[in-house]
Amino acid sequence: MTNENSNDSEFAELKIRGKIFKLPILKASIGEDVIDISRVSSEADCFTYDPGFMSTASCQSTITYIDGDKGILRHRGYDIKDLAEKSDFLEVAYLLIYGELPSIEQYNNFTKQVAHHSLVNERLHYLFQTFCSSSHPMAIMLAAVGSLSAFYPDLLNFKEADYELTAIRMIAKIPTIAAMSYKYSIGQPFIYPDNSLDFTENFLHMMFATPCTKYKVNPIIKNALNKIFILHADHEQNASTSTVRIAGSSGANPFACVSTGIASLWGPAHGGANEAVINMLKEIGSSENIPKYIAKAKDKNDPFRLMGFGHRVYKNYDPRAAVLKETCKEVLKELGQLENNPLLQIAIELEAIALKDEYFIERKLYPNVDFYSGIIYKAMGIPSQMFTVLFAIARTVGWMAQWKEMHEDPEQKISRPRQLYTGYVHREYKGIGER
């Protein structure tokens, strides 16, 4: 295989059944290089085995870079902390999709397009009526997003010219559907988007306004939610993003692809972790109980797990968690809860104790992005069943950037993982009366 990133003078040798194969090493612009194993199956009659794809690069990407050992997260080369503190969500969305920060004119045009496409077809309202009142907002959202392909049949056979408009439509409509999912779950009327508001203000308006009551957006709350959206916008080839790419590799329409991402995100090991953190803090109950629960977390025979600590990639403090810790304090101070919020006090003391404990230090278990986000959501008045829905709003930007990049990659093929078969070799069929 030839690749513009390969280095002819550098290769890895793989010996299989006495035969040596030279595998090109593909050079990363930063971070780990990659061994190209694409020829192994055809030339050596072997596949590689990597459960969970922990050591496998499924694609080339220029969008997001993570150094888990150093606690670095960058989008298109920009540090996540700088983006969270200095940018806004739609500017980051533009960056992820187009590769560069926008000019004033580009930014204004982009935000106008997002606002223009925020309405959903009125017939979609009837779909919501088919759900029972106790339906989880993620279940409603999953169905509603998938149904969008029925309203945009032209995208069943999309072209390269459709990529950008498709991304804009998705970014615009997901918050509307998310707010509708919440409103339906609590029995309130849907609130239409307001194009005079910015992206984050508009979402809060659709969530908390009613036909008889206007919602006044608190700027501290707005800024906090803006940061949360930025911090969750993309995170390289995680489970849901990989799911979107795999679905997209078959040529499936973009609404179907995003709905698969939502389904993957709904898993408690992925998008549902911040809700688990809240439940854990409630279970701990008070600071006095922290040592007992630390001991339970260390006991391999105890089912209790310390939620919000550790990450599949980060072996250092998650840079997103550092931003959210300060954001959490800002929000609670604004709401008059900084000194008397029991969950925050437990979280801060739990973090302090864990970071000094050799058990957690040796295992590199540091607070992750989920540790403080749930406390912020709860203080904002957002119920726990909506936590993953908000995650999906933010991650839609990353999904669409990755989906677009995948379709623009000339090397990308339909995804087809292989397996190590360990079942029966061959069995003769017997009729039901002979078994």
Curated annotation (Swiss-Prot):
Source organism, top-level taxon: Bacteria
Record's keyword terms, sorted: Transferase, Tricarboxylic acid cycle
Entry GO MF terms: citrate (Si)-synthase activity
Gene Ontology BP, a term: tricarboxylic acid cycle
EC category name: transferase
Pathway as given in its UniProt record: Carbohydrate metabolism; tricarboxylic acid cycle; isocitrate from oxaloacetate: step 1/2
SUPFAM superfamilies: Citrate synthase
Active site, per annotation: 311, 370
InterPro entries: Citrate_synth-like_lrg_a-sub, Citrate_synth-like_sm_a-sub, Citrate_synthase, Citrate_synthase_AS, Citrate_synthase_bac-typ, Citrate_synthase_sf, Citrate_synthase_typ-I
Gene Ontology CC terms, in alphabetical order: cytoplasm
Catalytic reaction(s) noted: oxaloacetate + acetyl-CoA + H2O = citrate + CoA + H(+)
Keyword set includes Transferase: yes
Enzyme Commission code(s) on record: 2.3.3.16
Extra remark beyond the main annotation: Citrate synthase is found in nearly all cells capable of oxidative metabolism.
PANTHER family the UniProt entry points to: CITRATE SYNTHASE
The family this protein is said to belong to: Belongs to the citrate synthase family.
Protein name according to UniProt: Citrate synthase
GN (gene name): gltA
